[in-house]
């Protein structure tokens, strides 16, 4: 499958030596358009939307429409928590498999149900692997994941490598929304060492500038900032740099 416009943009930035900043907005408690514009002006590369249960595609389309009316030009990528998060007005979707789920539905069942919808809507699909590490949060609970222990970074790296061998072009290490601590640096470093093509992004529990910087230095291609952006935009901006 050929690279789409959004994925080409992300890869071109990484290839030029930049690190990615992915802003995450939950459509149930969305980040305001003005705040999204602030992040856009300060280097955000894409806006991820999704992850909530209590949301319909209409809610997401309405939110995207508000963002565009307010002048937000960032590429908008769906970060689906389920079929209810697939909306036609997005630019792309992280077409994800939850690699360490114990439930086949989250490994392949949801993807089979989603594929015809994504195709029909003409969304750019970015083949992605979602891997829950440590705390896991709501994503780990809903997805029936067997979270990788914080102290076993080599297991996270093995999952990442398996994902790349299976065709994933983006690997997303997730500690969980609002997690007490982020994905460990050694897990990021181990995965970065074995991945040759897939982009590696890390999210969950990143509350300080140093936490983001450490993971980027360890080899992550980008960080995902969500809860912090909702609660303290200024601090989130510092963490993304």
Curated annotation (Swiss-Prot):
HAMAP family: GGGP_HepGP_synthase. NCBIfam families: GGGP, GGGP-family, PRK04169.1-2. SUPFAM superfamilies: FMN-linked oxidoreductases. GO terms for cellular component: cytoplasm. Prenyltransferase that catalyzes the transfer of the geranylgeranyl moiety of geranylgeranyl diphosphate (GGPP) to the C3 hydroxyl of sn-glycerol-1-phosphate (G1P). This reaction is the first ether-bond-formation step in the biosynthesis of archaeal membrane lipids. The keyword Lipid metabolism applies. One of its GO terms (biological process) is glycerophospholipid biosynthetic process. It is found in: Cytoplasm. Keywords: Cytoplasm, Lipid biosynthesis, Lipid metabolism, Magnesium, Metal-binding, Phospholipid biosynthesis, Phospholipid metabolism, Transferase. GO terms for molecular function: magnesium ion binding; phosphoglycerol geranylgeranyltransferase activity. Belongs to the GGGP/HepGP synthase family. Group II subfamily. Its EC number is 2.5.1.41. It catalyses: sn-glycerol 1-phosphate + (2E,6E,10E)-geranylgeranyl diphosphate = sn-3-O-(geranylgeranyl)glycerol 1-phosphate + diphosphate. Mg(2+) binds at residues 26, 52. Pathway: Membrane lipid metabolism; glycerophospholipid metabolism. Its main location: cytoplasm. Disulfide bonds: none annotated. Its cofactor is Mg(2+). Sn-glycerol 1-phosphate binds at residues 172-178, 204-205, 226-227. The keyword Lipid biosynthesis applies. This is Geranylgeranylglyceryl phosphate synthase.
């Amino acid at each position: 499958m050929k690279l789409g416009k959004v994925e080409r943009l992300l890869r071109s930035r990484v290839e030029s030596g930049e690190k990615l900043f992915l802003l995450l907005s939950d459509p149930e408690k969305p980040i305001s358009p003005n705040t999204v514009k602030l992040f856009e002006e300060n280097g955000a590369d894409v806006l991820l939307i999704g992850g909530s249960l209590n949301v319909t595609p209409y809610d997401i389309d309405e939110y995207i429409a508000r963002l565009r009316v307010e002048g937000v030009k960032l590429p908008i990528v769906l970060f689906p928590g389920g079929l209810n998060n697939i909306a036609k007005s997005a630019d792309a979707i992280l077409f994800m498999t939850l690699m360490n789920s114990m439930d086949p539905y989250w490994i392949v069942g949801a993807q089979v149900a989603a594929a015809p919808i994504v195709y029909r809507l003409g969304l750019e699909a970015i083949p992605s692997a979602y891997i829950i590490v440590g705390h896991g949060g709501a994503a780990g609970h809903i997805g029936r994941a067997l979270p990788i222990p914080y102290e076993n970074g080599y297991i996270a790296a093995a999952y990442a490598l398996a994902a790349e061998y299976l065709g994933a072009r983006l690997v997303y290490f997730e500690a969980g929304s609002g997690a007490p601590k982020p994905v460990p640096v050694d897990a990021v470093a181990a995965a970065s060492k074995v991945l040759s093509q897939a982009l590696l992004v890390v999210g969950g529990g990143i509350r300080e500038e140093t936490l983001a910087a450490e993971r980027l230095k360890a080899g992550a291609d980008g960080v995902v900032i969500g809860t912090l952006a909702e609660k303290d935009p200024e601090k989130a901006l510092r963490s993304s740099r």
